Amino acid sequence: MADAWDIKSLKTKRNTLREKLEKRKKERIEILSDIQEDLTNPKKELVEADLEVQKEVLQALSSCSLALPIVSTQVVEKIAGSSLEMVNFILGKLANQGAIVIRNVTIGTEAGCEIISVQPKELKEILEDTNDTCQQKEEEAKRKLEVDDVDQPQEKTIKLESTVARKESTSLDAPDDIMMLLSMPSTREKQSKQVGEEILELLTKPTAKERSVAEKFKSHGGAQVMEFCSHGTKVECLKAQQATAEMAAKKKQERRDEKELRPDVDAGENVTGKVPKTESAAEDGEIIAEVINNCEAESQESTDGSDTCSSETTDKCTKLHFKKIIQAHTDESLGDCSFLNTCFHMATCKYVHYEVDTLPHINTNKPTDVKTKLSLKRSVDSSCTLYPPQWIQCDLRFLDMTVLGKFAVVMADPPWDIHMELPYGTMSDDEMRALGVPALQDDGLIFLWVTGRAMELGRDCLKLWGYERVDELIWVKTNQLQRIIRTGRTGHWLNHGKEHCLVGMKGNPTNLNRGLDCDVIVAEVRATSHKPDEIYGIIERLSPGTRKIELFGRPHNIQPNWITLGNQLDGIRLVDPELITQFQKRYPDGNCMSPASANAASINGIQK
């Protein structure tokens, strides 16, 4: 029996020792688990922050208003609570997945990247995946909160749940790490990507021809255009500045008065309102603190606003102003003349007229720098020869236009027979149709100015001359004060404030620069039938360095590289040697103003 009891006591001792060892193991595991939780918590926060930032980055890249290329610093500015390193890491991850194409650049002193192109479909898929992961994490957090709210008497269940959650988190993090390693590009992929980026950089650089074309259309000597002031005269501009200064000072004074009154009101409320020392008192204290902070912010804003207003009002207006022309017979109470500088009776008109108020402090004799000197020396094309203005005084009804050769662009402002008194003669519809315009072009463009009832006649003439109407320009007329004309001299039922220019095409013209200009010209009205000078710039940009001719031109229409024809020009001036020889053969006496001279020239040509 003694042996049996000894065996039993040994077994109990062993069991107690095993229990003690198990308890010690559990204590060690618990201590280690607490340490691991403390270490893993910041990592989880970083992962969650990365997911949120990645979601915002994907939303910013998939937006329709994104302008490419864009630098990573600009993406950081759009996303609150993000750093440049985090955004660069996310962009590199997206580039490895093939959603975007980036290029490494240096932004100031920091290294960054530039987004060149975006794949919308892949970005959409990645955004959906990130949204799903965010939703899963939110659901897990809700479940944990629900579990924490329930009172659990046993500590073992809490420890088991924490261990399970740790295992799940580690099991979730493990495949992410594996996917990260798999998505990392290899050295071969990096080399091929670098080669592709270098090729793309070479392709995006402008060529020498593109740079020369851009240099060609720059203004000689830089931009010399001044903006008109919206207030009109200098007096009105100063009045407006004083009014804004007074308003700013008034607002500043009102804010100061409110700031002085608010402390008294708050003190009175504290004396009369006896609040017990409870949570409500703390809330009132918080509200009072917020009110004081708001007052300080408003006072700071008012000081800033007053400084800006004072700086704005003290600055002089650098825009262009007008000056009233006050004569002995002018009556200012009548107001402005509706025709302004186009008034035919300015010497006796009692209404107010204007002239540009020149600025005496502007130095017109500025030394030209090297860039402007180089821009003045540039030419258009070595292959084409440019000539100074050329013109022929002639009657277009009788001129033999085959002598002139072929042109790339034709512009015509015909004297249409409209029901209106004009300072020049007009042509009938049949005479317009019989003009020799088809001989001027085989392939090219025509710009035909039309007005009133001549719009339909102009379309008929284009068809008859062999053109197809492809576009239309509109000239919106403004007066001297840069306002839209409301009392025009044309129009039977409504005052016309615009004119139309039909654009026709013949054949298949080449070397046209499409899409450079708009089809609307907003320009000031000058003399009768004086078209805006902007049309010449539009035509030159559309077809640079080519032969151009203008029909029914006047002395103010002569332009370099243009031949102008009209009966109001001063004689004949030709520079092109080929054109001179052809014209002298056809018109030896140089007279092409009458049908008799044209017939005599044709008879002489037949006899020779």
Curated annotation (Swiss-Prot):
**Region Gate loop 1: start-end pairs:** 414-428
Q: Which family does it belong to?
A: Belongs to the MT-A70-like family.
Region of interest: Disordered: 250-272
GO BP term, pick one? mRNA processing
Q: Taking the first listed entry, what is the main subcellular location of this protein, grouped into a coarse class?
A: nucleus
Could you tell me which Pfam families the record lists for this protein?
MT-A70
Family annotation (InterPro entries): MT-A70, MT-A70-like, SAM-dependent_MTases_sf
| Function noted in UniProt | Catalytic component of the WMM complex, a complex that mediates N6-methyladenosine (m6A) methylation of mRNAs, a modification that plays a role in the efficiency of mRNA splicing and is required for sex determination. In the heterodimer formed with Mettl14, constitutes the catalytic core. Required for sex determination and dosage compensation via Sxl alternative splicing: m6A methylation acts as a key regulator of Sxl pre-mRNA and promotes female-specific alternative splicing of Sxl, which determines female physiognomy. M6A methylation is also required for neuronal functions.
* Species name: Drosophila melanogaster
Where do the record's region annotations for Gate loop 2 lie? 525-533
Biased composition, class Basic and acidic residues, residue ranges: 250-265
User: Gene of origin?
Assistant: Mettl3
Q: Does the keyword Endoplasmic reticulum apply?
A: no
According to the UniProt record, where is the region Interphase loop?
480-497
Official protein name in the record: N(6)-adenosine-methyltransferase MT-A70-like protein
Q: Enumerate the SUPFAM superfamilies for this protein.
A: S-adenosyl-L-methionine-dependent methyltransferases (SSF53335)
Q: Tell me the domain comment.
A: Gate loop 1 and gate loop 2 regions are adjacent to the S-adenosyl-L-homocysteine-binding site and display large conformational changes upon ligand-binding. They may play an important role in adenosine recognition. The interface loop contributes to the heterodimer interaction.
* UniProt tissue specificity: Expressed in testes. In the ovaries, detected in germaria, prefollicle, follicle and polar cells (at protein levels). Detected in the ooplasm and in the cells of the 16-cell cyst of early stages (at protein levels).
The lineage is: Eukaryota, Metazoa, Ecdysozoa, Arthropoda, Hexapoda
Q: What outcome is recorded for mutants in which this gene has been deleted?
A: Flies have a reduced lifespan and exhibit multiple behavioral defects: flight and locomotion are severely affected and they spend more time grooming. They also display a mild held-out wing appearance resulting from failure to fold their wings together over the dorsal surface of the thorax and abdomen. RNAi-mediated knockdown results in semi lethality and reduced fertility due to the presence of compound egg chambers with supernumerary nurse cells in the ovaries.
